[in-house]
Amino acid sequence: MRLGKPKGGISRSASQGKTYESKRKTARQRQKWGVAIRFDSGLSRRRRNVDEKPYKCTKCSKSFSQSSTLFQHKKIHTGKKSHKCADCGKSFFQSSNLIQHRRIHTGEKPYKCDECGERFKQSSNLIQHQRIHTGEKPYCCDECGRCFSQSSHLIQHQRTHTGEKPYQCEECDKCFSQSSHLRQHMKVHKEKKSHKRGKNARAKTHPVSWKRGKGRKAVAGLRQVKGAASGLFKKKK
C-alpha cells in the first residue's frame, strides 16, 4: 500500500524544519537589539542548569538566562514603571513587585509555615522564618567565623570589624552602625524639641504667669547670690 503525499505537496518534516528555521532567524534578529526570544523551552531549561546567560543588556552589560528577565531588567534603564497600584498610586517595574505590594492593602499572607502555621506575605520571609525551626545559618563572617540566619544580620555584624557607620543623624551628625541605633538616638532630639515646644506654648497661652514664674526664679537666684555675698562679708569681719 502506497502512502499518498500530504495536501500542498510538502511533507510534515519539511514544514517543521521551515518553522524551526524561521524561529531561529527571528531569534537572531531579536538578539541583534539585545533581546532574544525563547524558541526552545528545553534549551532554556538546560541553560539554567549550566548557568549560561546568553541575553546581555546593552546598557550595563548584565547577563540573563531568559529573554523575559532581560526585558524586565531593561525597564530599569528606561525608568518606565508600567504596573501601578490602584489603591495608593505607587508604580513598579515588574508585575510581581506590584502583586507583593498589593498584599499590604489586602493583608493577604499566602505563604504558610508547616511547622508553626505562621503566615507571610512574601516567600523570602517564609524562608528566613523557617531557619528558626531548622537552625540553619548559611551566612558566615570571613573574619571570625560567626554565622547568621539572615544576610542583613551578617552585614550588621561585619561593621563591628570594619568600623563602618553608614547611618548619620541629620541633627548632630553623629553616626551609627545600625539603623535601629539611629532611630533610638533620634528620640533624644524629638524629646528635646517637644519639651521646647511645650515651653513656647505655655509662654503664648499664659504669658503673665509664665513671666511671673520666670521672674520668681530670677528673684530667687538674686537672693541666693546676695545671701552668699553677705556670708562672705561677715566672715571677713
UniProtKB/Swiss-Prot annotation:
Residues 1-33, 188-218 are annotated as: Disordered. The keyword Transcription regulation applies. GO terms for biological process: odontogenesis; regulation of DNA-templated transcription; regulation of transcription by RNA polymerase II. One of its GO terms (molecular function) is zinc ion binding. SMART domains: ZnF_C2H2. One of its GO terms (cellular component) is nucleoplasm. It is found in: Nucleus. The modification N6-acetyllysine is found at K18, K23. Pfam families: zf-C2H2 (PF00096). Highly expressed in the ameloblast layer of mandibular incisors, moderately expressed in submandibular gland, calvaria, kidney and lung, and expressed at low levels in brain and thymus. Keywords: Acetylation, DNA-binding, Metal-binding, Nucleus, Repeat, Transcription, Transcription regulation, Zinc, Zinc-finger. Residues 188-217 have a biased composition (Basic residues). A zinc finger (C2H2-type) spans 55-82, 83-110, 111-138, 139-166, 167-194. Belongs to the krueppel C2H2-type zinc-finger protein family. Binds DNA through the consensus sequence 5'-CAATG-3'. May be involved in transcriptional regulation and may play a role in tooth formation. This is Zinc finger protein 22. The gene is Znf22.
